[in-house]
Amino acid sequence: MLSEGEERALLDALDDEFKAWTTYDQVLRDFGPARPFVNIVDAEARHIEALREVFARYGLEVPENPWTGRVPRFASLREACEAGIEAEIANVALYDRLLRSTTRPDLLFVFRNLRRASQERHLRAFRRCASRGR
């Protein structure tokens, strides 16, 4: 059985992944299949699925995505990439906090993997995108 803090951590993680997926999906709707969004939106879907598996393991109800129709729109791909940088930095900070909320190996494994994806892959991709001006 999860503690209240662990449940809150899972909900916070899922909410953040929903927000990222919905934001990056909106960028693709607005600008077409632009890199790095076309790759990262797929990664965000995998992150959501990883969290859904944890929810199922503990018998928790998976909430609906609250971000549909509520994410920002950007004037350019560069602006979207700059926002992606900020979002991924915030995501790393979120997972730093969530990693302190549990000692459960399965939660730590998922939180570390999702943090690593933001820090080592998504953040780098958005920085490259912003530096290209697209």
Model feature map: region roles:
Residues M1-R134:
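All-alpha RGS (Regulator of G-protein Signaling) helical domain and cognate RGS-like helical scaffolds
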